[in-house]
């Protein structure tokens, strides 16, 4: 039974949805945060992690290919990076939840700051097409673990911004996804109206 439950926790075929308004929020939204705990974990392999980062536009196609090659050269490090990604996702989920609820989460913040410090060592200014300077990364893609650097940095940018005032959690049953509410009136309730909003309407209809 325990092994069946463990298998049900993962969702290797579930699509990634980019509805959070920020890549770091979409990173947390790669699993469903239900009252029973984490379900439908879409990070089932390092390849899926690369697929998500490419879809979130944190990697271009060439960089995604480099990470796939790095995983072939360093399979154990790729597996360790997948484990680190899941652990970081839990940490970031706790931080986002603390922002939404207004509670303090000092242990999670301390751990996050350690990640930010370690990540900052790899940040560089690089020339973008056209000659403009932009932030880049030292040897991004040479090692599987470098995949998490852009995610950590985008999370730090978000948490240090005024956008946290617009951070919300979906009101859908068994969803728990977060999003930055940039609606005109600031009254968005769902991660996606077509998914959780419609499901809630159908539930209400069924109980009439």
Question: What name fits each language-model region?
Answer:
Residues 1-168, 176:
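Short helix-coil boundary/hinge micro-motifs
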């Amino acid at each position: 039974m325990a092994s069946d439950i463990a298998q049900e926790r993962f969702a290797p075929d579930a699509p990634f949805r980019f509805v959070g308004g920020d890549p770091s929020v979409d990173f947390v939204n790669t699993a469903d945060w239900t009252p029973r705990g984490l379900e439908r974990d879409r990070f089932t392999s390092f390849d899926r992690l690369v697929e998500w980062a490419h879809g979130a536009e944190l990697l271009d196609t060439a960089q995604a290919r480099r990470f796939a090659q790095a995983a072939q050269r360093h399979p154990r490090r790729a597996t360790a990076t997948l484990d680190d990604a899941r652990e970081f996702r839990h940490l970031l989920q706790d931080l986002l939840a603390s922002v939404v609820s207004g509670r303090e989460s000092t242990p999670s913040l301390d751990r996050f700051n350690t990640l930010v410090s370690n990540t900052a060592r790899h940040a560089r200014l690089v020339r973008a097409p056209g000659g403009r300077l932009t932030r880049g990364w030292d040897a991004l893609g040479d090692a599987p673990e470098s995949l998490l650097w852009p995610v950590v940095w985008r999370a730090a940018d978000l948490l240090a911004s005024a956008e946290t005032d617009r951070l919300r959690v979906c009101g859908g049953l068994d969803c728990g996804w977060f999003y930055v509410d940039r609606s005109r009136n600031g009254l968005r309730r769902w991660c996606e109206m077509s998914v959780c909003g419609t499901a809630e309407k159908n539930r209400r209809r069924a109980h009439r």
